[in-house]
C-alpha cells in the first residue's frame, strides 16, 4: 500500500519549528561534571528532520526563527549548505538566543540531555512570519510538538496548519515531546490533540501518544481509532527495540523491526526515523518499506556521535536493510 501526495508541488517537505545547537560530549562513559570537550552541531527535531530529508534527496524547506548572532548564523549556514531552503528563516532582533542542548553519554543505555531553553528565539516565531505561498508549494508540512509549547510560536504553527489544509498540503505531526518546555500535562494534551486531530500523518512513540492522551498504558488501537475519526489516515507508533507500527485508515497494519547496531547514544533516533520514513512515502515506496527505511535510519544515527551530521544517505539505509533482511 502506498501513500499519495500532490506531485505538482515544488517542495517535498517544509518543516516548521526549532533549530538550535547541540553540544555533544566528545568524552564517553563519564558524567557531564567530568566532561571537558563538546562538539557543536545543529539540533532541534524539525531542523534535524529537514536536514535528514535533504540528505536523502528531498527538496526541503524550513520555517523558523534564529538569533541574530554567531549561533544563528551557524545554524542557517549549515542548513543551507546541506540543501535546505532557508529563505523563510526569520531572524530575531530582540536579543533572544538559540536553545542549547548539552548531551551526556555515560553509556549507550545511559544518555541524558541538559537543556537551556529559557526565552529562546525559536519560540518567538510570529504568525506574521508564516508565508502562505511558501506552505502552499509543499507536498507536506512537518510540525514539531515542541513548537506548540509557547506563544507566539504556538499560534504560528496553528496558522501554518490551517494554511496547509487550505492548500491541500499534507500535515505531518511529529509529537516530539520535551517535558522541560511545557508547564503542565493538561496543557500539553490540549495542544497536541488540537494539532493531531487536524493532521494527516501522526508519528510518535507509545509514551508520546500517552502524553497526548494524558494517561498511561494507552493502547495503539484506541489511539488510532480516535485519530481516524478526525483527519488522520496514517498513524505511526514506535515501540523502541520492539519495532514500530503503521496503521492506515483503511485497516491495514504494518510492522518494522528495530535493526541491530552498536549503540553509542540514544538521542537523534526519532528525527532520523521521521526523515527516512517520509522519504520512503514521498518517493513512492509502500508503507511497509517506508517503515523499514525509518527504522534503519534510526539505527544508523544512534551508532554515531551527532544527530544532524549523522543523518544517512539512501545508499547507507538500503545497505543496512539488505544486510539484516
From Swiss-Prot:
Pathway: Polyol metabolism; myo-inositol degradation into acetyl-CoA; acetyl-CoA from myo-inositol: step 5/7
InterPro entries named in the record: Carboh/pur_kinase_PfkB_CS (IPR002173), DKG_kinase_firmi (IPR022841), Myo_inos_IolC (IPR030830), Myo_inos_IolC-like_sf (IPR023314), PfkB_Carbo_kinase (IPR050306), PfkB_dom (IPR011611), Ribokinase-like (IPR029056)
EC annotation from Swiss-Prot or TrEMBL: 2.7.1.92
The keyword Kinase belongs to this UniProt entry's keyword annotation: yes
Domain of life: Bacteria
Reaction(s) catalysed by this chain's protein: 5-dehydro-2-deoxy-D-gluconate + ATP = 6-phospho-5-dehydro-2-deoxy-D-gluconate + ADP + H(+)
Record SUPFAM superfamilies: Ribokinase-like
Annotated keywords: ATP-binding, Kinase, Nucleotide-binding, Transferase
Any GO molecular function: ATP binding
Any single biological process term in GO: inositol catabolic process
NCBIfam families registered for this protein in UniProt: myo_inos_iolC_N
HAMAP family: IolC
Function: Catalyzes the phosphorylation of 5-dehydro-2-deoxy-D-gluconate (2-deoxy-5-keto-D-gluconate or DKG) to 6-phospho-5-dehydro-2-deoxy-D-gluconate (DKGP).
Recorded family membership: Belongs to the carbohydrate kinase PfkB family.
Record protein name field: 5-dehydro-2-deoxygluconokinase
Species: Bacillus licheniformis (strain ATCC 14580 / DSM 13 / JCM 2505 / CCUG 7422 / NBRC 12200 / NCIMB 9375 / NCTC 10341 / NRRL NRS-1264 / Gibson 46)
Amino acid at each position: 500500500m502506498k501513500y499519495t501526495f500532490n506531485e505538482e508541488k515544488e517542495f517535498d517537505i517544509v518543516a516548521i519549528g526549532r533549530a538550535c545547537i547541540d553540544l555533544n560530549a566528545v568524552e564517553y562513559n563519564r558524567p557531564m561534571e567530568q566532561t571537558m570537550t563538546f562538539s557543536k552541531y545543529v539540533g532541534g527535531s524539525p531542523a534535524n528532520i529537514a536536514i535528514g530529508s535533504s540528505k536523502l534527496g528531498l527538496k526541503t524547506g524550513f520555517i523558523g526563527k534564529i538569533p541574530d548572532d554567531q549561533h544563528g548564523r551557524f545554524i542557517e549556514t549549515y542548513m543551507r549548505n546541506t540543501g535546505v531552503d532557508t529563505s523563510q528563516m526569520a531572524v530575531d532582533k530582540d536579543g533572544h538566543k538559540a536553545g542549547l542542548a548539552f548531551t551526556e553519554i555515560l553509556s549507550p543505555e545511559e544518555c541524558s540531555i541538559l537543556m537551556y531553553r529559557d526565552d529562546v528565539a525559536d519560540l518567538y516565531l510570529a504568525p506574521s512570519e508564516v508565508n502562505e505561498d511558501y506552505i502552499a508549494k509543499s507536498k507536506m508540512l512537518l510540525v514539531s510538538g515542541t513548537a506548540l509549547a509557547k506563544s507566539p510560536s504556538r499560534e504560528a504553527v496553528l496558522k501554518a496548519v490551517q494554511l496547509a489544509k487550505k492548500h491541500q498540503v499534507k500535515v505531518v505531526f511529529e509529537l516530539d515531546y520535551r517535558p522541560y518546555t511545557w508547564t503542565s500535562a493538561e496543557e500539553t494534551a490540549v495542544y497536541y490533540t488540537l494539532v493531531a486531530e487536524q493532521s494527516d500523518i501522526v508519528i510518535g512513540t507509545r509514551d508520546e501518544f500517552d502524553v497526548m492522551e494524558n494517561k498511561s498504558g494507552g493502547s495503539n488501537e484506541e489511539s488510532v481509532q480516535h485519530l481516524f475519526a478526525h483527519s488522520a489516515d496514517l498513524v505511526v507508533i514506535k515501540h523502541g527495540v520492539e519495532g514500530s507500527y503503521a496503521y492506515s485508515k483503511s485497516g491495514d497494519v504494518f510492522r518494522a523491526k528495530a535493526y541491530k547496531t552498536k549503540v553509542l547514544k540514544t538521542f537523534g533516533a526519532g528525527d532520523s526515523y521521521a526523515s527516512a520514513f517520509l522519504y520512503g512515502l514521498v518517493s513512492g515506496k509502500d508503507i511497509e518499506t517506508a517503515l523499514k527505511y525509518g527504522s534503519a535510519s534510526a539505527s544508523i544515527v544512534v551508532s554515531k556521535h551527532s544527530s544532524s551530521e549523522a543523518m544517512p544517505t539512501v545508499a547507507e539505509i538500503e545497505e543496512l536493510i539488505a544486510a539484516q533482511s
